């Protein structure tokens, strides 16, 4: 089917009731609070997990062995390592760990040592390492970063700060969690934003996008994927300069995201230094607008457009 399988593991949490925890003496790898207790987190599975210390030799060995097994024994396209570039460092007062007590740069260094070693040991040129979110200190460690925790409150207006700074040296996918239902305009808006900010598209459960009531969304996603392939040379290695709005198209209500123009735009500069304007009409209606050059164009419903257009940087 042409699908690339990248299994999930967690780079930070460990189930204390798991067999591996007992086998590897996982308690020795955990972050220890000042009072001697462990950090505990509970997610959707409702199973308590403890936070592992990235400087622990035990945790580094466990992560390395799991990545090696997945990448070689299963021959997958890579490994997705959750939470590493997402969660903030925890203080650790375990005197047996190879770091100063409390906080410090040892946290990031532990992860860097861990995954640099794992890559050299287990990941070939046709495989990737991916993680959640986009902490700066890990950009060079991962081939793909999943952007997923963007605030969805309607009174907020997220800005593409990370892509503006790092779009020419990082690859990322996603925009935010995709709420239900997806056929109320929110998925098309998220897809448009993702494309314009440089994200790889398609981060959604397959069952939701192939559902009978999501045919327009599936069509839009397919068109945007085809368009992204067309402008890949701009987005990969290029630099996002900022967003652009025509200012003459109607605003649309997006559940969970507030009001936004029916046509969204972004200014990019390719690796060759050429300026481009990308536009996406995520509405079911066509819209006329004026380009920065003064030229008038009409964008068809659920379509995208690109051209070499001088755009003043702001």
Each model region followed by its residue ranges:
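Short, well-ordered coil/turn segments that N-cap beta-strands
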Residues: 1-3, 75-77, 123-127
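Aromatic-lined substrate-binding rim segments of carbohydrate-active enzymes
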Residues: 1-6, 98-103
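Active-site-adjacent "subsite" loops/lids of carbohydrate-active enzymes
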Residues: 3-74, 158-162
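Hydrophobic faces of well-ordered beta-strands that scaffold small-molecule active sites
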Residues: 5-8, 79-81, 129-131, 201-203
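Active-site-proximal loop/turn and secondary-structure-junction residues that shape catalytic pockets
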Residues: 9-15, 85, 133-137
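Short low-complexity, flexible loop/linker segments enriched in glycine and/or proline
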Residues: 15, 19-30, 93-97, 143-147, ...
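Active-site-proximal substrate-binding groove within the catalytic cores of carbohydrate-active enzymes
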Residues: 60, 64, 107-306
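Active-site groove signature of glycoside hydrolases
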Residues: 62-95
């Amino acid at each position: 089917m042409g699908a690339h399988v990248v299994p999930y593991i967690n780079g930070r949490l460990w189930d204390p009731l798991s067999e591996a925890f007992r086998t590897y003496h996982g308690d020795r790898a955990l972050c220890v609070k000042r009072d001697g207790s462990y950090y505990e987190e509970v997610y959707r599975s409702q199973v308590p997990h403890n936070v592992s210390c990235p400087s622990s030799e035990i945790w580094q060995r466990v992560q390395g062995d799991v990545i090696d097994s997945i990448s070689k024994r299963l021959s997958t396209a890579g490994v997705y390592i959750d939470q590493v570039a997402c969660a903030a460092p925890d203080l650790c007062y375990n005197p047996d760990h190879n770091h100063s007590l409390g906080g410090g740069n040892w946290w990031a260094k532990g992860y860097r040592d861990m995954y640099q070693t794992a890559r050299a040991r287990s990941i070939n040129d046709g495989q990737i390492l991916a993680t959640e979110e986009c902490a700066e200190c890990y950009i060079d460690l991962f081939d793909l970063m999943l952007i997923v925790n963007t605030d969805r409150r309607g009174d907020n207006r997220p800005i593409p700060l990370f892509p503006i700074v790092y779009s020419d040296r990082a690859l990322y996918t996603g925009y935010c969690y995709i709420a239900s239902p997806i056929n109320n305009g929110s998925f098309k808006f998220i897809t448009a934003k993702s494309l314009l900010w440089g994200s790889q598209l398609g981060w959604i459960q397959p069952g939701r996008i192939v559902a009978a009531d999501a045919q327009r969304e599936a069509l839009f996603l397919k068109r945007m994927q085809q368009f992204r392939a067309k402008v890949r040379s701009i987005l990969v290695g290029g630099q996002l300069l900022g967003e652009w709005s025509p200012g003459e198209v109607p605003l649309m209500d997006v559940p969970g995201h507030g009001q936004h123009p029916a046509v969204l735009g972004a200014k990019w500069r390719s690796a060759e230094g050429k300026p481009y304007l990308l536009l996406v009409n995520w509405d079911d209606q066509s819209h006329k607008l004026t380009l920065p050059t003064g030229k008038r164009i009409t964008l068809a419903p659920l379509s995208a457009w690109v051209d070499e257009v001088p755009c003043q940087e702001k």
